[in-house]
Amino acid sequence: MFEKYIMYLKNLIFFQFIVYFFFISLTILIIKNFQQEYSKSILDKQVAQENLTEEVLKLYSVINSKEEILESYKKYVALSVPKNSVSCLNYQELIPRIKSLGSKYNLVEPIDVSINSVFFKNNVQVIEGENESIHVNNYSINIKYACADFLTFLKIFSEIYSYMPPNTLISFVRVRNEEVLTPKNIYKLSVNHAPNLIYTKLILYIRELSSK
């Protein structure tokens, strides 16, 4: 009788162990699953917050850009000079002013200047103002010049930029220093000029507002 009781206790303990083991394993599995889901939800939340922040920054950028354009346009309209002649006159004067620096700094070669229209993929070309539409025209100014030393390069660069409208963007600057004379510049040597050792290429972006 005692042996049967012992056997019964063993079976009961074994059964309870199996049940407890099952519930503990199930609980651990559920906890791990919840942890994975929680980690995934946190990651998704972070990604969503990053995307939201990016979109908000884009929105603010667009709003601020539009406000700046409208503010610039108001200042532009406030000028007493006729609208149609302002931009043309400025661009007609800009190239000769830049080229005149070649004579001012006694450069061997004339400064090469060209102005081209630029169309940006995401650029807003027309903005509705209070009374009329505002057209945004983008231009790139490509400039090449060579000089004898770095100090002259800086002076010319500073003067060129001073001729530009406010908020002009410097998109590209390349300065090459020829430390020795090459066949390309030997034949240009003269007693009246120092040899060109600094070769520069600039690309500037400017924005023009016009109304129609």
Swiss-Prot record:
It is a single-pass membrane protein. The chain crosses the membrane at residues 11-31. Keywords: Membrane, Transmembrane, Transmembrane helix. It comes from the Bacteria. InterPro entries: Uncharacterised_RP854. GO terms for cellular component: membrane. It is found in: Membrane. This is Uncharacterized protein RP854. The lineage of its organism: Bacteria, Pseudomonadati, Pseudomonadota, Alphaproteobacteria, Rickettsiales.
